[in-house]
Amino acid sequence: NPNQWRLKADLAGGGALREVGIYALQACRDLTGEEPAVISAMETKTDLEKFKEVDETIVWTMKFPSGVIANCSTTYNFNGVKHCKASCSNGWFGLDPAYGYSGITGKTSKGDLKFESGDQFTGEMDDFAKCINEDKQSRVAGEEGLKDLIAIEAIYKSIRTGTPVKLS
């Protein structure tokens, strides 16, 4: 639907990167325990009219201080792809779906990963309510959101300039 709110910049605040790409970005930051040092990105639009206000498809590469390289992508062009895979010299793991509302499933080079079933958002809301009721800091600090936004801005800058962006 070309008139849906996700395609209106003033309502959505962004496009595919800010709505769904952030999950891949967060996964890479969480898995490495590091912030990206260099980000390179590019954007593709298959329908310039439909996606005139927001990004449709973005691919980006993040280089981390440890040498880890993460290749990520996000799109509004099609749905159903919600996987994450990490590989290294002694094995791999993958989640598919990695970002679903109805649970996560995964495998490793050594077998299946087991997760508690449940709604992720219920846990988030329970934690938020507990923090308010008990005057405690959330386990997901606001600084994490700021770090995500710094990386997102670097992705957009790389798209605009066509060059890699170094982060401090």
Task: Name each model-derived stretch.
Residues 65, 113, 130-168:
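C-terminal helix-rich "cap/oligomerization" subdomain common to oxidoreductases
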Residues 43-57, 62-126, 141:
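NAD(P)-dinucleotide binding in Rossmann-like oxidoreductases
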Residues 16, 20, 58-60, 136:
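Glycine/small-residue-rich pyrophosphate-binding loop that anchors the diphosphate of NDP-sugar donors
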Residues 17, 21, 118, 139-146:
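Conserved loop-to-helix N-cap of the C-terminal "lid" that shapes the substrate pocket in Rossmann-like
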Residues 31-35, 89-93, 152-158:
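Phosphate/oxyanion-binding loops and surfaces in catalytic or ligand/nucleic-acid-binding neighborhoods
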